[in-house]
């Protein structure tokens, strides 16, 4: 039965991934290579982006197609929303996988993808905004009955911190 469940799970994952005709990977290096290999196993064409310095990188060679998005400096390439979105539009990608770092925690990027009709493979912009701020994240967790460690929320005075420290210990 375990083998059956594994096959069923893999078929389900394949069907979910088939929702995408082409995935742009908004990253470089090992994470981009891993995403490209996973997409290849699922039969999904991939688009790599790269800076001028990364033109000969493995992820560029492995992808179905690749686009240079700017100079070596990350701020002018891998962190450039206009450059990444241009590559997505030109390539016809219908989804963008951010990998980690760079665009993976940029709520504004996820929102732009959504507005352009491109699926952001990751959390929604709203979820990123809520979880990006510790106070809001904690409040959201408490409101949804998720256990959290003892904490104070936002404190305004030294006295509040001292009172909490005496009450909870440290």
Where are these regions (language model features)?
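N-terminal amphipathic/hydrophobic targeting modules at extreme N-termini
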Residues: 1-11
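N-terminal beta-alpha lobe that positions the nucleotide/phosphoryl donor
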Residues: 15-170
């Amino acid at each position: 039965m375990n083998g059956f469940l594994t096959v069923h799970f893999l078929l389900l994952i394949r069907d979910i991934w088939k929702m995408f005709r082409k995935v742009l990977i908004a990253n470089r290096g090992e994470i981009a290579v891993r995403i490209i290999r996973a997409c290849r196993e699922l039969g999904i064409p991939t688009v790599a982006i790269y800076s001028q310095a990364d033109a000969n990188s493995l992820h560029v060679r492995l992808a179905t197609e690749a686009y240079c998005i700017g100079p070596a400096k990350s701020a002018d390439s891998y962190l450039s929303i206009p450059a990444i979105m241009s590559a997505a539009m030109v390539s016809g990608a219908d989804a963008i996988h951010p990998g980690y770092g760079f665009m993976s925690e940029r709520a504004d990027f996820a929102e732009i993808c959504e507005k352009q009709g491109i699926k952001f493979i990751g959390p929604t912009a709203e979820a990123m905004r809520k979880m990006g701020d510790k106070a809001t994240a904690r409040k959201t967790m408490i409101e949804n009955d998720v256990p959290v460690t003892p904490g104070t929320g936002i404190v305004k005075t030294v006295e509040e911190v001292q009172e909490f420290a005496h009450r909870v210990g440290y």
